[in-house]
C-alpha cells in the first residue's frame, strides 16, 4: 500500500511538472519560427553593438538610445562596461550615433545600466529624459535635462520607491511624473526567476509623482512596454509572457480602467506611439525561449508589428518586419520618423529602414 501511494505521488508530481513545463513553453512561444518580412534599404546603425533596448525620437528627429543593458538571465555582449545614452540625428543623410556626456556628480556612471526611457517636453521647450536604471540589480528612475547645444545630459534627480522594485519601462507625463511597469513583483534575482517560471502574474503598473504613488493596474505576466495615446486619454500596456497588449482608459486622478485586450502570437515588448497617426509600433520576440536561453547557433529572431485603429472593433495588425536573427537579434523597440523605421534590440544591434 505504501509503495502504491508513493508511486501515485510520484506520478502526480511528474504530471504536474509536465503540464507546467508545457505551459512555460507556451508562454515563451518556444516553438515559433519566423516567416521573414523584409523592408527596402535597411542599414545597421553604426556604433551600436551591445543593444538599444529602448529609443525615443523627438519631433525634430533627434533620437535617444538606451544601450548596454545588463538584465538577469539575458545575454550581454559586454557585461563589464556600464551602459550609455546615445544620440542620433535622423535628419542626416547618413545618421551616426554619439555618446551623450552625463553632467553632474550625483550619478554613479560606473554602475549606469539604462533600460526603458521616456521624454517629456515642458512648456518652455525644456526636454527631460527619464531613464530606468538598474545599478547593482536595483531599480531607479534617473531624471535628466537634455542640453542640446552641449550634447549632454544634466542629471537632476534619482527616484526610488518601494512600489518600484523591478521597473522595465516608463511613460513620462511630467519632469518627475510617470507611469511605470514592474516586470516582476520581487527585486531579488532568485525570487524573480521563480516568479517568472511559475507564471505568478504578480507584476503591475504604478503611477508616480512627487505627491502620490499608487498601483494602477496589476495581475500581469511580465508587464513590459507602456505608451500613452496622442490625446492622452488611453494607456497601452504590453504583457510580454501573455502575448497581449492592454488598453486602459486614463482618468483625471491618474487611475486606469481596463478597456480592451489584443492577443498576439509573439512576445510584445516596447510600445511606441506614432506621433502623426497614433498607430502603435511594437518591438517583439517571436520566440522567447531563444531570448532567455541564448544560443549563438540558434539566435533569437526579430519582429515589428504595426497596430492601426487600436480602439476600433477590428484593429489592423501588420507584421512590418521579421527576421530570423541573422541580421538582428532580440527586437525590443521600433519607432518611425518621416518614412523611416528605427529598430532596437535588447543586447544586439539597431537597424534603420525605409518604409
UniProtKB/Swiss-Prot annotation:
PTM remark: The signal sequence is not cleaved.
Cystine pairings recorded for this chain: 42-353
Cross-referenced SUPFAM superfamilies: Calcium-dependent phosphotriesterase
GO molecular function: acyl-L-homoserine-lactone lactonohydrolase activity; aryldialkylphosphatase activity; arylesterase activity; calcium ion binding; high-density lipoprotein particle binding; phospholipid binding; protein homodimerization activity
Location of the protein in the cell: Secreted, Extracellular space
Entry note: cofactor: Binds 2 calcium ions per subunit.
Domain of life: Eukaryota
Active site as annotated: 115
GO terms under cellular component: spherical high-density lipoprotein particle
Reactions catalysed according to its record: a phenyl acetate + H2O = a phenol + acetate + H(+); An aryl dialkyl phosphate + H2O = dialkyl phosphate + an aryl alcohol; an N-acyl-L-homoserine lactone + H2O = an N-acyl-L-homoserine + H(+)
Positions contributing to Ca(2+) 2 binding: 54, 117, 169
Sites carrying sugar chains: 253, 270, 324
Entry comment describing in which tissues the protein is expressed: Plasma, liver, kidney, heart, brain, small intestine and lung. In the plasma, associated with HDL.
Chief site of localization: secreted
Record keywords, A-Z: Calcium, Disulfide bond, Glycoprotein, HDL, Hydrolase, Metal-binding, Secreted, Signal
Binding annotation for Ca(2+) 1: 53, 168, 224, 269-270
EC number: 3.1.1.2, 3.1.1.81, 3.1.8.1
InterPro entries on file: 6-blade_b-propeller_TolB-like, Arylesterase, Paraoxonase1, Serum_paraoxonase/arylesterase
Function description: Hydrolyzes the toxic metabolites of a variety of organophosphorus insecticides. Capable of hydrolyzing a broad spectrum of organophosphate substrates and lactones, and a number of aromatic carboxylic acid esters. Mediates an enzymatic protection of low density lipoproteins against oxidative modification.
Subunit structure: Homodimer. Interacts with CLU.
Note: The preferential association of PON1 with HDL is mediated in part by its signal peptide, by binding phospholipids directly, rather than binding apo AI. The retained signal peptide may allow transfer of the protein between phospholipid surfaces.
Name of this chain's protein: Serum paraoxonase/arylesterase 1
Amino acid at each position: 500500500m505504501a509503495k502504491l501511494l508513493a508511486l501515485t505521488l510520484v506520478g502526480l508530481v511528474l504530471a504536474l511538472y509536465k503540464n507546467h513545463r508545457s505551459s512555460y513553453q507556451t508562454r515563451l512561444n518556444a516553438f515559433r519560427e519566423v516567416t521573414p518580412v523584409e523592408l527596402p534599404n535597411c542599414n545597421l546603425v553604426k556604433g551600436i553593438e551591445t543593444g538599444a533596448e529602448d529609443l525615443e525620437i523627438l519631433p525634430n528627429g533627434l533620437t535617444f538610445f538606451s544601450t548596454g543593458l545588463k538584465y538577469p538571465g539575458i545575454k550581454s555582449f559586454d557585461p563589464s562596461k556600464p551602459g550609455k545614452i546615445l544620440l542620433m540625428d535622423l535628419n542626416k543623410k547618413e545618421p551616426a550615433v554619439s555618446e551623450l556626456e552625463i553632467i553632474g556628480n550625483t550619478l554613479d556612471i560606473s554602475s549606469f545600466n539604462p533600460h526603458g526611457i521616456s521624454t517629456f517636453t515642458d512648456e518652455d521647450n525644456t526636454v527631460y529624459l527619464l531613464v530606468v536604471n538598474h545599478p547593482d540589480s536595483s531599480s531607479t528612475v534617473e531624471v535628466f535635462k537634455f542640453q542640446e547645444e552641449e550634447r549632454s545630459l544634466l542629471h537632476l534627480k534619482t527616484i526610488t520607491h518601494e512600489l518600484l522594485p523591478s521597473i522595465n519601462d516608463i511613460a513620462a507625463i511630467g519632469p518627475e511624473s510617470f507611469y511605470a511597469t514592474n516586470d516582476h513583483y520581487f527585486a531579488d534575482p532568485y525570487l524573480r526567476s521563480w516568479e517568472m517560471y511559475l507564471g505568478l502574474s504578480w507584476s503591475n503598473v504604478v503611477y508616480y509623482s512627487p505627491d502620490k504613488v499608487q498601483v494602477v493596474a496589476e495581475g500581469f505576466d511580465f508587464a513590459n512596454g507602456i505608451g500613452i495615446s496622442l490625446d492622452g486619454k488611453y494607456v497601452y500596456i504590453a504583457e510580454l509572457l501573455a502575448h497581449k497588449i492592454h488598453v486602459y482608459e486614463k482618468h483625471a486622478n491618474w487611475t486606469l480602467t481596463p478597456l480592451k485586450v489584443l492577443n498576439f502570437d509573439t512576445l510584445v515588448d516596447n510600445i511606441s506611439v506614432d506621433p502623426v497617426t497614433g498607430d502603435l509600433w511594437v518591438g517583439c520576440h517571436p520566440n522567447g525561449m531563444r531570448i532567455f536561453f541564448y544560443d549563438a547557433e540558434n539566435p533569437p529572431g526579430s519582429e515589428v508589428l504595426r497596430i492601426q485603429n487600436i480602439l476600433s472593433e477590428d484593429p489592423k495588425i501588420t507584421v512590418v518586419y521579421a527576421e530570423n536573427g541573422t541580421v538582428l537579434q532580440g527586437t525590443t523597440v521600433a519607432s518611425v520618423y518621416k518614412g523611416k523605421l528605427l529598430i532596437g534590440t535588447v543586447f544586439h544591434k539597431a537597424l534603420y529602414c525605409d518604409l
